[in-house]
Amino acid sequence: MGGLQNVRSAALIGHNGSGKSLLLAQILYKSGLIDKADTKYVDYDPVEEEKGASFSSHVASLEWKGKKVYLIDTPGFSDFISEVINGIFVSENIISVVNAVAGVEIQTERTWNMADEMKKPIIVFVNQMDKERANFENVVAELKERFSRKIVPVVVPIGAAENFEGVVDLLKKKAYRYDGDKVQEEDMPESFNDMRSEILEDIVEQDEELMMRYLDGEDIGYDELMRVLKEGYKKGEIVPVLSGSALKGIGLDLLLDYLGDIGVSPEEAPSYKALLEDGTEIEVKFSEEEPFCAYIFKSVVDQFVGRITFAKVIAGVLRPGDTVVNVQKDVTEKVGHVYVPILKQQKEVESAGPGEIVVLLKLKEGAVGETLAHRDRRVKIVPPAFPEPMFSRSVHPKSKSDIDKISSGLSRLSDSDPTFVWEYDPETGETVVSGLGAMHLDVMIERLKKIFGVDVEVGKPKIAYRETITTTAVAEHKHKKQTGGHGQYGHVKIQLEPLPRGQGYEFVDKIVGGVIPRNFIPSVDKGIREAMKKGVLAGYPVTDVRVILFDGSYHEVDSSDISFQIAAIQAFKKGMEAAKPVILEPIMEVEVFVPEENAGDVMGEISSRRGRPLGMEPSGKGMVKVKAEVPLAEMLDFSSKLSSITSGRGYFTMRFQRYEIVPPNIQEKIIEERRREMQEQEK
């Protein structure tokens, strides 16, 4: 069974509810690796167990007719698309699982397009043929309508719903009827001849010589048909379609047969792009002779075991006791045991070569997207592109004892998911987590609680507002304090002027004649900077102000650094109040990608959020890109609304553009809310 040619890996992709997890569980049960065909063996994450759904990818290895097979079950929810992206990235084959009742759904289309972008060949498995209203012909017609690749049904159902009893392999001309674990093989009924003739034409047209023989009336043999089917599949030109039922275990053996017979092996697969230490781009091919290299595509934090790392071996061979380097972190790791995954169990192996998936325990580092490599060739595999996390919430530990634990827990969780990030904002004093949607953050926060024991309160993150002035004003303040010994004396006159947006702060010294000694000028500057930390309207930092120090006075004995700082602080506050202050808000440059039919609704939604649409342009595959500028305060729940408008097909990116003045009616609300906040803090 050794050798690259005998390894197969496939990612199971599709919409939530298409039956991917049950399909994997049934395959493992039929292979004798688990006791029962139950998704509880697949969804073993503590949050998944509680909610009964898949929120992460699950990996299993098995042996099938002389092949080492690795299957990656990916989640069907769009919020967990990073798991799908990585699953596709490390698989040489893709199995798109389609619900025979619902047909092509949103995630069917989105994940298919991802496989297209990564140039991965696709097999379709039409699942749930035993369900009421299952319709194989409708699904095939929909696949042909939606996707550009040639759709070729090769394993078709016998009956449907309660009459579903088996499948026909049109190429082998064999029918398979299932009765529990028993399978009866028989010749293909004549009623399937027309269907077979139709798909033969689709296959033989891939090979000109074969097509001529077929047109001359020659009966093309099974081996030649499979050879041409494999060539078309490998090139991404043909999509073989199979059918069955994961629940009843029908057609799964044929699915594995086709994966073994036409599936792409590591030996036939394209190379991975990588970077050398000096930034030179190279390609790393699947090879036992090359120095070791593996890509980390999954990282799990287990409350008992610790860090569990899943890696795809691309080059070289990994053995227990080997020393490897985490290239991104520049950390040397000593590999203890080497395992292959069987869901939450692991099987220890003596070695793992190219194309195989390994599980490593208790590595010091190992975030998703990082590379483990031989110390003499520290290559970094270029990871796939992940969507930017745009849905944010603030989190606060419910217990003071959890303050130290929250950073550690969030860091470990972000290691496991490149679309989950967190940061502490010193300006607002908040810890802010960001992900791809409300469900995404809910699951990550639940994991924080169940795995790390940190319970948090969740809220909308505070907006980093600013305050500024809109006109020129002059102010002065004389700070005078007499005590028993030395007193305090500082006197400043300043002029405040608005600066162009984004200029920050400028201090101008126009003192002449020594009315304020040179050694106290920095004290005035320091006092003004301190005053600018809290504006007079709502206590937000002040920006875009020029302060000119033009006059003042001092006392030979009582003047000091602190005296001039206090005088400057008070003078600045007076000046700002007189200079017609306003609140500024961050404006984001937003790009929204939506289906063409939803563009109008999305433009309207943007306008209702005080946004300015800037234009629209095609972005391919029936999608358009809407460009706009929108206040950040209006984008906090946009992700959920966009998902609702586009049925989960839309997504967006945004980046900070500039600050702008808040409209007066909005400013009043911000000031009132800020006052309530400060009153709460004082209690």
Curated annotation (Swiss-Prot):
CDD domains on file: EF-G_bact, EFG_III, EFG_mtEFG1_IV, EFG_mtEFG_C
Q: Which GO terms describe its molecular function?
A: GTP binding; GTPase activity; translation elongation factor activity
Record bears the keyword Zinc: no
Q: Which residues bind GTP?
A: 14-21, 73-77, 127-130
Q: Which PROSITE patterns match?
A: G_TR_2
Keywords attached to this entry: GTP-binding, Nucleotide-binding
Where are the membrane-spanning stretches?
none
Which family does the record claim for this protein? Answer: Belongs to the TRAFAC class translation factor GTPase superfamily. Classic translation factor GTPase family. EF-G/EF-2 subfamily.
Under which name does UniProt file this protein? Elongation factor G-like protein
